[in-house]
Structures are given as C-alpha cells and as structure tokens.
Amino acid sequence: DRFAADTDVFIRQVFERHQKALLGYAGDFRCHSRHLLNKRSFLFGGHHTALDGNIRHILSNIFLEYKDSQNSLLLSFFRIFASFSPNIVMSPVAVIITVLGYILLLFVFARISSRKAGNAAFFTGNRRTPWYMAASAMIAAAMSGVTFISVPGSVAADAFSYMQMVMGFTVGQFIIAFVLVPTFYRLRVVSLYEYLDTRFGITSHRTGAWFFFISKMSGTALKVYIVCAVMQGLVFNHYGIPFWANAALTMTFVWLYTQRGGVKTLIWTDTLKTVCLVASLVLTIVYLMRGMGWSLADTVQQVAASPMSRIFFFDDPASGYYFWKMFSAGIVLLVAMTGLDQDMMQRNLSCATPRDSQKNIILTAFCQIFVILLFLVLGVLLYRYVESTGLPMPAKSDQVFAQVAVNGGLPLAVGVLFVIGLISSIYSSAGSALTALTTSFTVDILTATKHDNDQALTRTRRIVHIAMAACMAVVILGFEYCADDSVINLVYKVAGYTYGPILGMFVFGMSTRRRIKDRWMPLVAIAAPLLSGLLQYVARTHWHYQIGFELLIYNAAFTMLGMLLLTKKKDEK
C-alpha cells in the first residue's frame, strides 16, 4: 500500500537518476522486471499494484545494476526491494527468507569444516586452530542474542556504565591468558573440570561439571527463549505456528550444524557469525545516522553530549554502578564465566600451543572493547531516532532495537540486518553451549574418554548430543509456558550463583597445596550460594547496601572457606 502511495515520487526520482541508462534499455531484462513485480506483493504483504511501462523499464535497469555489482543474490534481492520505498515495513516472509539464507550459508560452512571430523575434532578441534581464527570466533561467542537486544536498550537506564565492567573484562582476559591457559595446556585436558579430578578427586570433578551443566543449560535456554520470542512475534504468529514448533525447529538446526564437527565446526561458523554480527551493527549505525541526517562528526558530538553516554560513576559507593564495584566484578566475572567455562574456553584450547592461545585471548580482549562500545553507541542512536521520528516508545527497553529496525521507517536493509545479527548471535550461543554441554557430560560425568574405545566414544557422544539438544528445547518451552518474569529472573540469578563454587574450587586448588575430604564437596558447593543469597538479603534490608555483580566474589569466598574446613590433616589419606 505504501508502495502505491510512493509511486509518483519513485518514478520522478529514479527516472531522473537513470534517464540516460533507460535510453539504452535492453529488452532482454523485461522478464526480470515482471518477475520482481509479481513477487513484490508476496514479500511485502500489500496488494499487487499495476505499474506502467516506465516503471518496468526503471526496475529492469535497477536489476541490471545490481546484477553487475557482484553482490550475493540474497543481498541484491533485498536491496532492490528496499529501494522501492524508504517506508516499507518488513514482513514475515522477508524475515523467513533472511533467516533461511543465513542458515543455508551456515550449513555450507559447517559441511566444509566438518569433513573427516572425529572425536578429537569435536572436543578440541584437533588443537590445530589458527590463533587469529580463534580470536574472531571468540567475538561471536561473547555476544549472545541477549547482548544484541538488551545492551543497546539498556543505555537509557544504565548509560555507558557497562564500559566500567568491560575494563575489568580486559584485566580478566590477561589473567586467563597467563594463569589458566598454561595450566590447562600442561595437563592436556579435554574438559576444564578434569583439573578438579587431578587436584581433589572425582566427587569435586563431578560437582564442578554438574554446576556447569545447570548454569549453562538454564542460561543458554533462556537466551534462546528470548530470541525465539522475538521471532515468534515477527514470523510464527503470522502463520499460526505454535511456540513449541519454533523452539523445536531452532534446536534442530543448531543440532544439525554442530553434530559432526563440534569445536572444529564452531571455529569457522563463529567466524562467519562475527562478520555478520559486526557488519549488522556497523551498517545499522550508518543507516540511523543517515535517517537523522547526521555526519560522523555530528554523531560523535551528539553521543558525547548525551547524558546516556556517561561512563564513570565514582560518586556513590553504595550504588550498583560504582566504578570499583563494576571494575572488580568485571575481572571476577570474566575469569569465572569465560576462563572457567567449558563453553567459552573450548575455542581458546583448540589452538596448537599455549602461546597461540594467549595471542588469541589478548586480541579478543581489545576487539571486545570496540564491539561493546559500538553496541552502546547504537543504543543512544536508537533512542534519539525514536524521539526524532515520534515512534511510540516500547514498554520494555529490550524492544527498542526491534521496534526501530522493523517499524521505524528505515530502509528494509535495517530490518534484514537486525534479523541477521539476531540470528547469528543466537546460533553462535546455542551451538557453542550445545557442544560444551556434550563435551562436559561425556568427559566429566560419564567419563567415557577413560574407558570407551573410539567407536564407542563416538556413539556415546552422538547420543549425548541429541539428548542435550532435546533437553534445551524442553527448558525453552518451560520458560514459555511459565511466562512469568519473576521466574525468569530467578533462573538468571541461579545460573549466576553456580559460577561461584566453580571459581572458589579453582582458586583454592591453584593458590594452595591443601587436600580436602572430597566426598563432602557437594555440600560446600550448595551451601556457598545459599549463604551468598542470605548475605545479599541482609545487606539490602538491614545495611541499605546493594550487592551487585560482586556477589560472585562472596560466593567464591564462601566456597573456599568451606573447602578450608574440609582440609585433610597431614597424616590423613
């Protein structure tokens, strides 16, 4: 309908731009113009508009230009239709085509990278990954669908305070590179939690693995659920497809592209995802700048002048935004949730040598600063765009990006880029987590690598991989059918609490030579998060002090205190 309203303007603008070219119009391209016009109503949901010969000539000429530009077919296709009108709203079919195009490309990468892939390739990538490829893959690994949706939307309430934590992340990356990586390479571990077996015993080993399982399964399922909910609104509700089919389809695709190559496949597909995610981010910023008529200098000036761009908070030590709180929490969070997380470290440990792994981690640290800063800048631009255009402000900050991308009157390319960025981030997160869960369950809980031959190990690994995908789909459905924000927030908190005992166990093991009564370790690991939650409640209600991300530090400290109480005497075996 909007296409019809814009027809006269479209004719004048494009005819003037292509007047000379139209004089030399080649009749061979008439079939292309007719094909595009017939498909237009299918893609954008409007009624078919009868257009005269002039527009057919114009569209044919545009098609010729894009055909000769050597762009991908999918990109050219959307660029042609985006040029019809700057106000076309992205339809469900356009979303579907974008998603299917990306998934097709993903499967091509997965197929190529998983050739001759065995168990070693699945678990460790054969330890042959070039360090720069591992670094590019880690950028995608660090960004989930939640990052893509929530970080830009958070700037209205939190400003750029997240950058304080990112500074802590950078310090944490150096700790991982020069403390943890040499230890893991020296022990030649497949799963990180094998260290706990070597240091304390099998019970501590399985305790660490089970806590990782709970955290990763619930945390990743929640991230996938959030993106599935967005896709449900964009596509599936339009066709009456239930949410369970959405979740099942998503996890089936994730299982299919990771089931052969594992880590070896992840490295290459995550590199593709990094390119898609960063390109989507940068190009969306460019389109927003153009939409508001800003140059690069104008954009820098506007962002710097905005109160939403404040980074440092030194004024209130009791605030959750206080610099030293967020900086120290960033260090601890990064070490615990990256350095002691099988999901994140499996890429780092796929490099051939510790030195290569260290180079990869340091490069990732500096790239991460740049990418997160761009997400925050995007957030400021989104809010300014909503203000300048009079778009209705969504009830939740998480919906701002989707609102502007899909309904903001920007070129269709912005909607396409939003969907590509969203899908690439969630497939990276889910595929990586599924591989890590399969590795940890097979190696740590079933201990299949110790007693199975290669053929039996392959069979076990494949069964576990299917089971992990099915389990994650069930958890995603659980989030949908409970549909309670308080339950979802509780799951996020529980997932965060589980990293405290893991951090405490590793720090205790690496900083002391004490042996513990291994069989009691599960009790300590359960008690520490409970005590941390109690401390947080008392601090808030009685001391009027808000414990934020630094709760992880207290959690780890309680774990270490419990392990100290379990220390064996010198004459005790």
Segments from the language model and where they lie:
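Hydrophobic residues within membrane-embedded alpha helices
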Residues: 1, 15, 20, 43-44, ...
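Basic polycationic patches enriched in arginine
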Residues: 2, 12, 17, 30-34, ...
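Intrinsic low-complexity, disordered N-terminal segments enriched in polar/charged/small residues
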Residues: 4-6, 14, 23-36, 45-52, ...
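Compositionally biased, low-complexity intrinsically disordered regions
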Residues: 4-9, 50-53, 57, 75, ...
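Intrinsic disorder/low-complexity segments enriched in polar/small residues
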Residues: 14-21, 39-40, 66-71, 571-573
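Compositionally biased, low-complexity peptide segments typical
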Residues: 40, 52-65
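Short, Lys/Arg-enriched N-terminal segments with co-localized hydrophobic residues
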Residues: 63-89
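Membrane-embedded helix-loop-helix hairpins and adjacent transmembrane boundary segments
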Residues: 80, 89-573
